């Protein structure tokens, strides 16, 4: 009598990977337009685009070797949630919107990054 041996399967091999999320050409044009206006005023110096599971990030820097001054995050739509655009500074969420132009309106007012000094 022969016995069949059990086969161990790793679920990770069969699960679909989250689809990489990108900015559309229109969204990228809006972000780069905002970036170029701030560069012309001498406020921003560098930017980075990053893609993570379920999100795309556009980060702007005042100095190249610092943490981003602001990040604009595009999140992937979930079952009951549409795509969202989040403007954040560090861990603080400054604006959440379903459309990029609405999210970027926060930059129409003069924003200034305030950092508390220890003491």
Where are each of the predicted segments found?
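Negatively charged, low-complexity tracts enriched in Asp/Glu with abundant Ser/Thr
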Residues: 4-56
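Short aromatic-glycine-(Arg/Gly/Cys) micro-motifs in beta-strand/loop hairpins
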Residues: 4-6, 68-91
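Short, charged, intrinsically disordered terminal tails
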Residues: 6-9, 16-21, 105-119
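Short, charged/polar surface micro-motifs in flexible loops or helix N-caps
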Residues: 41, 53-56, 63-68, 78
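Hydrophobic residues embedded in beta-strands of well-ordered beta-sheets
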Residues: 55-58, 85
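A generic structural motif
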Residues: 61-63, 88
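Short, compact, well-ordered microdomains
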Residues: 79-117
């Amino acid at each position: 009598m022969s016995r069949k041996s059990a086969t161990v399967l790793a679920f990770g091999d069969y699960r679909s990977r989250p689809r990489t999320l990108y900015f559309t050409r229109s969204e990228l044009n809006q972000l780069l337009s905002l970036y170029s206006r701030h560069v012309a005023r001498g406020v921003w110096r560098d930017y980075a685009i990053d893609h993570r599971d379920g999100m795309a990030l556009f980060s702007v820097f005042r100095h190249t070797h610092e943490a981003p001054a602001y990040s604009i995050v595009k999140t992937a739509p979930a079952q009951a949630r549409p795509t969202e655009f989040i403007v954040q500074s560090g861990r603080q969420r400054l604006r959440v919107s379903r459309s990029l132009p609405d999210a970027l309106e926060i930059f129409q007012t003069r924003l200034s990054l305030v950092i508390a000094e220890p003491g």
